[in-house]
């Protein structure tokens, strides 16, 4: 639209629309970038408050949405995770949310080209050292996780899921 938004609306997989105030947004020669602060909800952890940046480049001659991990986003180094070894540790649900949001905006703007999106997390590489990531096979930064688009409080099920993941990798 050419205007810097006061809020950014995100549609979660559960259909809930969440509005957040960006830290900043800017246009570039080839697209735009925007940063938000990670909300930890009821599950405050070492990632709460970190700036998450989405940089989008318009690709008029390339269809679809390509998603990359930038600074502060880890790389998958072991099999058994959501993404293949070598890929950015951005799970399939956040990837789908990003793609769907861009596809909606493209339709609203009558844009028929593609997008290249780079997700970065300020302080992600340093913060990741204080997480499970190095143990489960994510190196160099944080994982972009999620199943519902809403932070759920830490639960026994989350702990069991982590243990199951480690067992799957050991098998």
Language model feature labels by segment:
Residues 122, 127-129, 133-171:
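Glycine-rich anion/phosphate-binding loop at the beta-strand->alpha-helix junction
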Residues 1-136:
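Generic N-terminal targeting/processing segments that precede catalytic cores or assembly contacts
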